[in-house]
Amino acid sequence: LECHRRGSFISDGKITCSAKKTFCCKMYEKIFGIYWYGCAKTYTEKNTWNVYSKCCTTNLCNT
């Protein structure tokens, strides 16, 4: 699985996930306006007052 990656100290691009990480995720930290993209081992989706996150089994949801 190849996911887009982005973080506060990581440049935009793509990363190949390890075999144990089967989800591409994106997370938006609403207070500071920081986006993070990458691979994840478990599925986590939430939308709270300070964090929005979404994961899927392709890289379509973390672009």
From Swiss-Prot:
GO CC, any one term: extracellular region
GO function terms (MF aspect): toxin activity
UniProt KW keywords: Disulfide bond, Secreted, Toxin
Gene3D superfamilies: CD59
Localisation per UniProt entry: Secreted
Tissue expression per record: Expressed by the venom gland.
PTM comment, free text: Contains 4 disulfide bonds.
UniProt source species: Dendroaspis angusticeps
Taxonomic path: Eukaryota, Metazoa, Chordata, Craniata, Vertebrata
Domain of life: Eukaryota
Role description: Activates bacterial pH-gated potassium channel KcsA by binding to its extracellular domain, probably at a site different from channel inhibitors. Increases both mean open time and open probability of KscA.
Name of the protein this chain belongs to: Toxin Tx7335
The keyword Disulfide bond belongs to this UniProt entry's keyword annotation: yes
Family named by the database record: Belongs to the three-finger toxin family. Ancestral subfamily. Orphan group XIX sub-subfamily.
The UniProt record lists the keyword Transmembrane: no
Disulfide bonds: C3-C24, C17-C39, C25-C55, C56-C61
